[in-house]
Amino acid sequence: MYHTMIAPNLYQDVDGRYRGMDLKIHQTNEFDYYTVFSLWDTYRATHPLYTIIEQDKTNDFINTFLAKYDEGGIMPIWDLSENYTDCMIGYHAVPVIADAFLKGIRVYDTEKAFEAMKHSAFQDKLGLKYYKKIGFIPMEEESESVSKTL
């Protein structure tokens, strides 16, 4: 169980300042700001566990997702410090937020969360333009086409 507490990592100074996805210094006093969301690996089991044992942290995580959305234009996929690593596919912040919302964990702007979920998921990135046009993502056009189609 202690392995579930290794990451995400708190990524702010004691006064709430942190470097955002836009590389600027921001300040938060409303929530703790985190990084190293390996959401590809954790959205299925670890984050649902957090909704049971760490509701406050779950709210902080979602508020962090929304701050990253404000600063960088999308929610994190697999972020490291103030960088989008672009090394995973999918938008796994979406099921994390949906699960928390359905469990009544909502100390964040729910309207903004819905906007961020739609914006992040419907960008014509990761082959989505092919899926919209022909119903699948051809392997000749995108790597990991089967996973991205599914």
Each language-model region and where it sits:
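Conserved oxyanion/phosphate-binding beta-strand-loop segments in alpha/beta enzyme cores
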Residues: 1-31
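Alpha-helical support elements that line or immediately flank enzyme active sites
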Residues: 1-12, 35, 41-58, 98-104
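Phosphate-binding glycine-rich loops and adjacent basic patches that engage nucleotide phosphates
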Residues: 8, 21-28, 55-60, 73-77
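Short, solvent-exposed loop/turn and secondary-structure capping segments
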Residues: 10-17, 48-51, 59-62, 76-77, ...
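Short acidic, glycine/Ser/Thr-rich loop/turn "cap" segments at secondary-structure junctions
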Residues: 30, 44-47, 77-82
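Secondary-structure capping and boundary motifs in well-ordered enzyme cores
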Residues: 32-41, 86-93
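Active-site cavity-forming subdomains of large catalytic enzyme subunits
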Residues: 57, 65-150
